[in-house]
Amino acid sequence: MQHNEEADGYDVVVLGSGAAGLCAALSAARSGARVGVFEKGELLGGTTCLSSAVAWLPNNRYAREAGIADSREGALAYLESLSHGMILPELAEAFVDTVPELLDWLDTTPLKMRLVAGYPDYHPERPGGMPEGGRSLEPELFSFIDLGRWEDKLVGVPRRMTVAETPIGGGTGHLPSEVQEQRERDRVEGLGRGMVAALLQGCLDEGVAVHTGERGVRLIQDESGRVTGVRFEGRGGLHDVRAEHGVVLATGGFEWDERLRRDFLRGPLAHPATVPTCTGDGLRMAMRVGAQLGNMREAWWAPVAVLPGQRANGAQAVQLVHRERTAPHSIMVNRHGRRFTNEATNYNALGGAFHHLDAHDFDYPNQPCWLIFDADHVEKYGAFGAAPGTEVPEWVVRADTLADLARRIEVPADALESTVAHWNEDVHRGHDSEYHRGESVYDGFVGDKDKYPGVESTLGPVARRPFHAVQIHSSTLGTKGGPRTDADGAVLDVDDRVIPGLFAAGNVMAAPTGMVYGGAGGTLGPALVFGYRAGRAAARTAGSPSEPDGILMEPTSV
């Protein structure tokens, strides 16, 4: 494909190449705009490539076709029940109301979605919640064959399956050898890289120019305050690119910038589970032109374990801790050797437990946190990459007694022994008397639901030696704060007025769902919706005839 590298720039300039950015670019191009996508990293796709690519999109037709009853009213009631006053109604309504239109539009692009059957909302017992699932969708498998030189320019490694084929989606996580070999020949992938590849293919088909190694450093404005371009830092140095109609920020969050984390987030965060390019570039650019900020204390919280000696995507490798804390025969304890939460709750809700501040000691008592599990857990479910019944990695702490394990992880032995004894008594009674683990439909979904349909899907005694421990860190899938926008993603200033020519979508914007993680895909659902809306709105915005500041140079491209 031939890139549109016109010296006078583009109608719409998009910063970032994750789901939000590529959806915005494709939407703008489909609306008739000349579009350029500029990615900070050398590879495309950002954190979307590392994800499962599940998108939480309520009131969708796939659920209705499967006989699942959902409604606009139910989805809005659900979000409101979790809002704590942090969700702006007009944004929630725009999100829910755009879902049918978005999915019809995606059907005309290379990205095709389908239902992840049975995946419940993360708070299914709340008003409007869906315990039977129906709101989480995933992309169909997509072939990379037609991507040409872009085929090997995506973040991450090939993953040739769908969520439905993994244990969380009801599958085994293993493909028959002949299926795996056929998918390798066809060069098809699912999950995050599959979603990015499909959106990228759509952009290339529409003539969108794609550039890597380009970090946005400043927005360019004319005398009236309209955003008319972007100053980039690339391999050739600083250069300016005109945006006749608008600029869409889709640069991700600020979780990799230590100072921004310190200044804005509500509690400690370590080892982000995202690409290291998420350092708040878009946030800083928006702040410089007077953007109003919102939701700055929040992130898409998630517990992780550090994988010693391993690196991924240019950073310390981590693993999201999901099944290990939800399957039977495991609990989590704080530095005092006490349980402090329902371990099987959704990963975002765990953030609140990690960030509890003790008013007397004025510290965070639940950090560090340790996952404690026994030999039965390892035998039945495996742990941290080890298959069921095999040896766990060498870095996992283990001991033949709880007292010795406590000594090794530096928690009080008497407290740990007492905690485990109380837990085992509760398991015998079939009820977690402290934190109600297993009572929500969601709790058991990631547990051993096939063998144990009730609370036993996540309850199991910690009794068989050897005992194991792994430190768990409060991490994130991205931050949720940034410039406030209207329903079309247009960025607002501190006086609630639109900053002409500036739009935002994805994790760089103030999340339209506030502190809520509605269900699986709670990040990518709004990213797709507001990327779609922002790209379309940017393409339809009248440009300014005035020249941007600085010297216009042809952007660097690979």
Please identify what each model-predicted range represents.
Residues 41-67, 77:
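Conserved N-terminal glycine-rich FAD pyrophosphate-binding loop of Rossmann-like flavoproteins
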Residues 184-193, 205, 234-310, 358, ...:
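Glycine-rich loop(s) and the adjacent beta-strand/alpha-helix scaffold that form part
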Residues 96-236, 258, 306, 420, ...:
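Conserved redox-cofactor binding core of oxidoreductases
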Residues 360-466, 534-537, 541, 548-558:
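Helix-rich C-terminal "cap"/substrate-channel and partner-interaction subdomain
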Residues 12-37:
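N-terminal Rossmann-like FAD-binding beta1-loop-alpha1 element of flavoenzymes
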Residues 132, 143-169, 173, 283, ...:
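An anion/pyrophosphate-binding glycine-rich loop and adjacent beta-alpha core
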Residues 218, 226, 415-512, 516:
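A glycine-rich dinucleotide-binding beta-alpha-beta segment and adjacent secondary-structure elements
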Residues 1-12, 30, 513, 517, ...:
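Extreme N-terminal leader/targeting segments of oxidoreductases
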